[in-house]
């Protein structure tokens, strides 16, 4: 504003000087009486134009209030060792058993610009390190079994009880093996007809198909955070920071308000010699008011994202509340094109660090479902 006014004043004085020179020149040329009216008219016109220009120029510098996302603060500082300690704090939990809500999100139609969210189901989960899991998923209210899955850390079994015949089966496999997606799982090639909308009748089949593609070890690694081995000479940790704009979900936030959240990003790299390294994991730590593991990403040998886990809503777990853990976990498998959201119903009632017999994590085909052994396919 001040700069615009200065420019305006300078132009005004310059043109006054110009008008004076015009009149003086006219007097010298003997045309004073012809110019005594033309000169002032010229000067007045120039000054009016300058006044309008100055006014419009000033308007461009008028202060306006613009809403911008505010940074969530305070931001807590931490070094790499403190970030590793936060991960290993979560990794101290040996076992969990609790009631959960499970919701699937089928991303098969992502190329159509949509994703289908299935109805929430109820579940009971038992998790134990290393890699032990038993999960039963039931329909709400009626308690009908939709699926069961188990793993003893080396082999897994998945039983699907609902849906069409091609979905109902008993699947066996090895945790460390990579398998092709089974026929009948959520579709790989989406049909984008009808503006990308699928028929409602397909919803249950899609849900069961997503269950068929779920592997117990993916579930275990998401809910029981693996520890980090800071003493491993082959691992390199690189810390950086990131700022992400998001919807303000605080209780008193205005509708539609947005904020900026600060993160530390810790890359876990494996040295491969000759000045090369492979990215194994990327860990995101929320810095607002404390240090909290907020996201965990895993990558394969080609650098492709294979697992993306988001952690929210930290709560006290167990009767004694000795552990503060995320009560909401969202697991995304981009290559398998599905997401799974798990929410603990009552974190305070979750059994923590109990010992479970080995048979807990083995599933038998008691209902004579069609068996599929992935190691023999």
Name each model feature, range by range.
Residues 2, 10-22, 26-58:
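Sec-dependent bacterial lipoprotein signal peptides
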Residues 56, 64, 108-149:
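Long, hydrophobic/aromatic-enriched structural stretches that serve as scaffold segments
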Residues 58-119, 203-213, 375-377:
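N-terminal leader/targeting segments and the immediate start of mature chains
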Residues 58-59, 212, 228-230, 235-367, ...:
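Gly/Pro-enriched, hydrophobic low-complexity segments
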Residues 88-96, 116-118, 126-131, 142, ...:
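Edge/loop elements at the starts and ends of beta-strands within beta-rich repeat scaffolds
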Residues 94-102, 121-125, 129-135, 147-149, ...:
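One face of beta-strands
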Residues 101-107, 140-142, 154, 158-164, ...:
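Hydrophobic lipid-interacting interfaces of membrane-associated proteins
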Residues 130-218:
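An acidic-aromatic
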């Amino acid at each position: 504003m001040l700069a615009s006014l200065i420019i305006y004043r300078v132009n005004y004085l310059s043109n006054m000087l110009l008008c004076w020179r015009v009149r003086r020149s006219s007097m010298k040329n003997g045309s004073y009486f012809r110019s005594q009216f033309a000169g002032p008219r010229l000067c007045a016109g120039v000054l009016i134009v300058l006044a309008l220009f100055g006014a419009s120029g000033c308007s461009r510098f008028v202060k306006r209030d613009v809403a911008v996302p505010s940074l969530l603060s305070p931001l807590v500082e931490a070094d790499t060792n403190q970030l590793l300690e936060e991960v290993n704090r979560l990794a101290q939990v040996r076992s969990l058993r609790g009631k959960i809500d499970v919701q699937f999100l089928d991303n098969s139609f992502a190329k159509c610009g949509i994703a289908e969210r299935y109805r929430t189901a109820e579940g009971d989960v038992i998790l134990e390190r290393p890699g032990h899991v038993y999960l039963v998923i039931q329909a709400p209210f009626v308690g009908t079994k939709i699926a069961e899955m188990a793993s003893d850390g080396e082999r897994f079994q998945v039983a699907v009880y609902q849906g069409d015949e091609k979905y109902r089966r008993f699947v066996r496999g090895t945790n460390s093996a990579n398998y092709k997606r089974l026929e009948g799982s959520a579709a790989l090639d989406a049909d984008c007809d009808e503006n990308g909308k699928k028929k409602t009748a397909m919803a249950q089949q899609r849900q069961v198909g997503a269950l068929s593609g779920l592997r117990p070890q993916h579930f275990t690694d998401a809910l029981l955070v693996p520890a980090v081995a800071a003493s491993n000479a082959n691992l390199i940790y690189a810390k950086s920071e990131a700022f992400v704009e998001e919807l303000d979900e605080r209780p008193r936030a205005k509708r539609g308000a947005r904020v900026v959240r600060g993160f530390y990003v810790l890359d876990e790299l494996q040295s491969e010699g000759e000045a090369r390294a492979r990215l194994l994991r990327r860990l995101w730590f929320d810095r607002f008011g404390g240090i909290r593991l907020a996201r965990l990403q895993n990558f394969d040998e080609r650098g492709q994202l294979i697992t993306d886990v988001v952690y929210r809503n930290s709560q006290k777990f167990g009767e004694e509340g000795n552990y503060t853990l995320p009560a909401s976990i969202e697991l995304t498998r981009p290559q398998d094109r599905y997401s799974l959201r798990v929410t603990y119903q009552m974190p305070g009632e979750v059994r923590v660090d109990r010992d479970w017999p080995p048979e807990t994590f083995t599933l038998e085909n008691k209902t004579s479902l069609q068996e599929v052994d992935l190691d023999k396919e």
